[in-house]
Amino acid sequence: MAKAKFERNKPHVNIGTIGHVDHGKTTLTAAITTVLAQTGQAQAMNYASIDAAPEEKERGITINTAHVEYETENRHYAHVDCPGHADYVKNMITGAAQMDGAILVVSAADGPMPQTREHILLSKQVGVPYIVVFMNKCDMVDDEELLELVEMEIRDLLSQYEFPGDDTPVIKGSAKEALDNPTGEWAKKIGELMEAVDSYIPTPERATDKPFLMPVEDVFTITGRGTVATGRVERGIVKVGDQVEIIGLAEETKNTTVTGVEMFRKLLDQAQAGDNIGALLRGVDRNDIERGQCLAKPGSVKPYTKFKAEVYVLSKEEGGRHTPFFANYRPQFYFRTTDVTGIIQLPEGVEMIMPGDNTEFTVELIAPVAMEQGTRFAIREGGRTVGAGVVASIDA
């Protein structure tokens, strides 16, 4: 059967299901597609097809992720669901599945569990900005007071991690009942959930609306014209005549003007997020700029050397280290287009980090790099990836 092509005329939002093992994340994902399929806004997916998530590689790390898509009246959604807890950790840290918001699934019969807490913490650390709660398995709980108690617990937990627990939408339902009877009473709860997601999770700012940033991949000189920096525009728009800063690696930030933009050997007036370009820079010497620096809109991003990171360390089976590492470990941190050596300080009370762990630690780089909360990086040792991380906060 041919897949119906989604019309991309609605705003696009990336979301995913998070929560403790067996609380019903995959069943809910199946229920959303099945209920929305009744109105032709999705292709119904059953539990087994979502659970058999294909393997993907992101920054050298193997992750199992299922992707489904569906529509509501107002939006087009791409939704990720992971089979195992480790897949969530890797997914969120590598940014393989960037989420504009998440649906936290909590079983009403069990209440919040260890991974519920861990996924909320991860969401905070990696910058998932909004969470909507689906209290699942409510068909198994007869006691209204118990449901209220679980809801209060969830709200408290969200507040502990600086999410607005009191204002977060909490929908009570049963994914299994909705999946088994997509036109029945429980199916209405799926409709309520999607209305909450529609209204509570804002449409993300498009990459082209953000301030200009381009990591420099290569630099060369055109005789008589000047220095050209090439790379892929990460976000924003750059026009001929724009002022930009050259940021990172050097002690000070330099200012210059883009006097030409070239793509596929054609001269353009402007380039935008996703374009691979050469930017001709006025008054910049070949030695003033190098791979690993960034061109950016003045004042939009700053270089730092010290930051706290949320990190996943590859297991031996994934090609990572075979042995743990300790404080003062000095690997390379690969930001965008280059490696910078950094020194690791472990949190208090932690003596070592084992392969396969996810953890938080502080890093001090030997040279500054343009970064902000949410910037991703890989950790490498002799060219081999041994971990992946995300900047959780900056120690200026």
Curated annotation (Swiss-Prot):
Disulfide bonds listed in the record: none
One cellular-component annotation, GO: cytosol
Stretch list, region G1: 19-26
Keyword hit for Cell inner membrane: no
Enzyme class: hydrolase
Residues holding GTP: 19-26, 81-85, 136-139
Region span, G3: 81-84
UniProt keyword annotations, A-Z: Cytoplasm, Elongation factor, GTP-binding, Hydrolase, Magnesium, Metal-binding, Nucleotide-binding, Protein biosynthesis
Residue ranges, annotated region (G2): 60-64
tr-type G domain: residues covered: 10-205
UniProt cross-references to Pfam families, sorted A to Z: GTP_EFTU, GTP_EFTU_D2, GTP_EFTU_D3
Catalytic activity reported: GTP + H2O = GDP + phosphate + H(+)
Ranges where the record places region G5: 174-176
Annotated residues for binding of Mg(2+): 26
Complex formation: Monomer.
Known role: GTP hydrolase that promotes the GTP-dependent binding of aminoacyl-tRNA to the A-site of ribosomes during protein biosynthesis.
Protein known as: Elongation factor Tu
Organism: Brevibacillus brevis (strain 47 / JCM 6285 / NBRC 100599)
